[in-house]
Amino acid sequence: YAHIGHDSVTGNHCILVNNTALAGHVHVGDWAILSGFTLVHQYCHIGAHAFSGMGTAIGKDVPAFVTVFGSPAEARSMNFEGMRRRGFSDEVIHVLRRCYKIVYRQGLTVEDALKELAEPAAQHPEVELFRQSILSSARGITR
């Protein structure tokens, strides 16, 4: 059993594992995987290819490709295994790894990190998807 609240939208190929609960107005991007007992606060956006660990409580937006764990949720990595399984090239995975480090490991503000992502986003549509999922966040991103 999984609960999908009112006016919520799930993308294609999503997996919502047992006892996952989405509050109202949640948006889950394509290929996202929400592990068992994941809770998602109303109005949150879960980006495409994102992954949540078991028992995660998500209260802010999760950018595309990001892996979150914990209660409250914290970003831990990117969903590299999911990318490999879906045929992403080693080059794209390497570039996304660098972009994750820009946002989550360099101590930059979100605004400054987005500026740093502009160049690789112009060259790789996957990075642009990651960048746009941060740029469009209304609740703030899980960090």
Regions found by a protein language model. Name each.
Residues A2-E74:
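Structural signal for interior beta-strand "rungs" in well-ordered beta-sheet cores
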